[in-house]
């Protein structure tokens, strides 16, 4: 495991090809670039989470080797592979777009995955999460009404097997944040502030963190 790199540069610099290439080459994966060819009102475009944000999440200590992470809308697999590599956790990516899923499967062959990463081609709203999953990551992969259905599946899993479970929401839209903060099953924790990593003062540059109540 390499020493975590601290990124304190603006947004344009953070997504420069040189910065992307450093991590892409180290991990042996290809995940860069935005793709909105299959986006619609239900599913948002593919845009990988910046590596500097993932570094900050890994540095938080909230995800450890003992954890099993689900990345909803995993795209080409960056989040799953990076966090498994840096924290030692097991990671499972859920993706509905077969083309992106196939690219993730190719990336999963990287030694960085070390048999701790897997990807599933599935509709997140219908997917039954494994009972060992205890962390979930979201980067606005789908519309709010779909998120509600996904949360329902997470709650169902907790009813089958009560356990601590933490949710991470990067760059949340205002309506999503309001919904989450008002939800009776969610306990808000200290968010991970990422505004200093980018140009300007974008209030959405953060990772919201919630603990899920097993029962009301």
Predicted segment positions?
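Conserved SAM-binding motif I beta-strand of class I
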Residues: 90-95
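A short SAM/SAH-binding and catalytic strip from SAM-dependent methyltransferases
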Residues: 135-147
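Conserved SAM-binding loop
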Residues: 104-105
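S-adenosyl-L-methionine
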Residues: 2-64
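Conserved SAM-binding strand-loop segment of SAM-dependent methyltransferases
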Residues: 114-122
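Glycine-rich SAM-binding Motif I of class I
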Residues: 77-81
């Amino acid at each position: 495991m390499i020493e975590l790199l601290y990124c304190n540069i603006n947004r344009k610099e953070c997504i420069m090809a040189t910065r992307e290439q450093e991590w892409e080459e180290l991990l042996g994966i290809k995940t860069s670039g935005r793709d909105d060819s299959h986006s619609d009102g239900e599913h948002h475009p593919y845009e990988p989470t910046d590596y500097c944000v993932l570094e900050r999440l890994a540095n938080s200590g909230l995800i450890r080797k003992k954890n099993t992470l689900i990345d909803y809308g995993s795209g080409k697999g960056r989040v799953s592979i990076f966090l498994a590599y840096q924290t030692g956790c097991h990671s499972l990516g859920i993706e509905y777009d077969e083309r992106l899923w196939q690219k993730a499967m190719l990336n999963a062959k990287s030694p960085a995955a070390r048999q701790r990463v897997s990807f599933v081609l599935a509709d997140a709203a219908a997917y039954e999460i494994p009972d060992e999953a205890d962390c979930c990551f979201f980067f606005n992969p789908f519309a709010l009404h779909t998120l509600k259905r996904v949360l329902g599946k997470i709650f169902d899993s907790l009813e089958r097997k009560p356990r601590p479970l933490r949710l991470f929401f990067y760059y949340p839209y205002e309506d999503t944040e309001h919904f989450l903060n008002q939800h009776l099953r969610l306990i808000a924790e200290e968010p991970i502030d990422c505004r200093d990593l980018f140009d300007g003062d974008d209030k959405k540059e953060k990772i919201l963190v919630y603990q899920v109540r097993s029962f009301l």
